[in-house]
A protein has these predicted regions:
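Generic beta-sheet signal
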Residues: 96, 123, 151-154
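Catalytic-site beta-strand/loop segments enriched in glycine and acidic/polar residues
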Residues: 108-141, 145
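Catalytic core of membrane glycerolipid acyltransferases/transacylases, capturing the structured
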Residues: 47-101, 145, 160-161
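A cross-family acyltransferase "interaction/gating" segment
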Residues: 135-182
Length: 182
């Protein structure tokens, strides 16, 4: 039964998630602040690392559709779901975490940065928390490659918080929201 359930979830993530999320995105009023940082780095073909809390991962996904960013994603089943959704948004997943395959994933990101231009995304508190307590991977990658870290903040007028460890932020349809590059 578990296998059938997992196959259904993966089918949803592969086939249905993108159209549903794009429709959902159309209901949001999204304001982007400091987008000039990304434009500046991209115009110079310079590497950078986007960093945001695990709880805020949905809005950056919707905003960065088609931009080819490489996101660090766990090797667990939840990570497979996220990987399939990322691919549908023309984003890349580098699989690994602090508990499984992290060293290999880190080396992939580091090689990408050193061979640049390369754009990476991290949730420094993921995949298992604790919530809003950053692990050192993002800082280490930045210090070893010279790539600046661009923190992302997210806010919304109407939202729901999931009961998960990260208290995932689900922005309600027809909300006003802000994505802020620091």
């Amino acid at each position: 039964m578990k296998k059938i359930y997992q196959k259904l979830i993966l089918f949803f993530a592969t086939v249905l998630a993108r159209p549903i999320l794009l429709l959902y995105r159309e209901t949001l009023s999204i304001k982007i602040i400091n987008k000039r940082y990304l434009k500046k780095f991209r115009s110079r073909n310079q590497n950078f690392i986007l960093s945001f809390w695990h709880e805020n991962m949905i809005l950056p996904l919707l905003v960065h559709d088609g931009q080819g960013i490489h996101a660090l994603v766990s090797k667990h089943f939840d990570g497979e779901i996220i990987t399939r959704i990322l691919r549908s948004f023309r984003l890349a997943a580098v699989r690994g975490s602090s508990t499984r395959g992290g060293k290999e994933a880190y080396q992939v990101l580091k090689r990408g940065m050193l061979n640049g231009p390369f754009e990476a995304a991290f949730t420094p508190d993921g995949p298992t928390g604790p919530r809003r307590k950053a692990k050192l991977g993002v800082v280490r990658l930045s210090s070893e490659t010279g790539a600046p870290i661009i923190p992302i903040g997210v806010a919304a007028t109407r939202y729901y918080r999931m009961g998960s460890w990260d208290r995932l932020l689900l922005i309600l349809p027809f909300s006003r929201c802000v994505l802020y590059y620091g």
